[in-house]
Amino acid sequence: MSSLEINNSCFSLETKLPSSHQSVEDSASEPSGYEAKDPPQDTLKDVDDVLEKPKDIIQFTAKKLSVGEVSQLVVSPLCGAVSLFVGTTRNNFEGKKVISLEYEAYLPMAENEIRKICNDIRQKWPVRHIAVFHRLGLVPVSEASTVIAVSSAHRAASLEAVSYAIDSLKAKVPIWKKEIYEESTSSWKRNKECFWAADD
């Protein structure tokens, strides 16, 4: 392998006026000498925050991961940075030629642990959206097994958050991989960082 991102809740908020109503701008007459002013920037920011709540998107899937699609899930007009981690299957391990990896996960615990990681990130950095997607089943060489994307107003927060996310995922989330070699042999592996899988 090389590395890993998930589905929480996405929603859009849409407000429409009935056709029989006019907007306040259209119907209200302006007093003489009235000068229109832009709303305060703080007010605009508050409105943006209400319309776009932070999202934690977590997904395990047997389908091929699209880095572009996962990245797009965290894009926000409030953010100037999207940072990514993409883990792919490499073609060798200790001199053996790897043709694919096979992933398994204990899903209830895995999803719960990733949500904890997302909460930890939000306590440490001012990020907007977080997406963590991980493949299950067979993943051929060069395909992505993990995609993590984080958006933030400035790049430092999202870069640090992505690094923390993959390190924590490898250490805490119950995911196993089987390396399948060219000579028709295979071997189950665990992440060395996993405290819960440590040898006695």
Curated annotation (Swiss-Prot):
| SUPFAM superfamilies on file | Molybdopterin synthase subunit MoaE
User: Which EC numbers does the record give?
Assistant: 2.8.1.12
Pathway membership: Cofactor biosynthesis; molybdopterin biosynthesis
> What's a Pfam family this protein contains?
MoaE
GO-annotated cellular components: cytosol; molybdopterin synthase complex; nuclear speck
Where it sits in the cell: the answer is: Cytoplasm, Cytosol
A GO BP term here is:
molybdopterin cofactor biosynthetic process
Where are stretches of biased composition, namely Polar residues? 16-30
Gene3D superfamilies named in the record = Molybdopterin biosynthesis MoaE subunit (3.90.1170.40)
List UniProt keywords, sorted A-Z: Cytoplasm, Molybdenum cofactor biosynthesis, Phosphoprotein, Transferase
Q: Name one GO molecular function term.
A: identical protein binding
Residues with PTM Phosphoserine: S20
Q: Which reaction does it catalyse?
A: 2 [molybdopterin-synthase sulfur-carrier protein]-C-terminal-Gly-aminoethanethioate + cyclic pyranopterin phosphate + H2O = molybdopterin + 2 [molybdopterin-synthase sulfur-carrier protein]-C-terminal Gly-Gly + 2 H(+)
Give the enzyme class: transferase
Where, by residue number, does substrate bind? H154, R155, K170, K177, K178, E179
Cystines in this chain: none
Q: Where is this region: Disordered?
A: 16-43
Q: Which InterPro entries match?
A: MoaE_sf (IPR036563), MOCS2B_euk (IPR028888), Mopterin_biosynth_MoaE (IPR003448)
- What is stated as this protein's family in its record? Belongs to the MoaE family. MOCS2B subfamily.
Misc:
This protein is produced by a bicistronic gene which also produces the small subunit (MOCS2A) from an overlapping reading frame.
| Physiological role | Catalytic subunit of the molybdopterin synthase complex, a complex that catalyzes the conversion of precursor Z into molybdopterin. Acts by mediating the incorporation of 2 sulfur atoms from thiocarboxylated MOCS2A into precursor Z to generate a dithiolene group.
Q: How does it assemble?
A: Heterotetramer; composed of 2 small (MOCS2A) and 2 large (MOCS2B) subunits.
What is this protein identified as? Molybdopterin synthase catalytic subunit
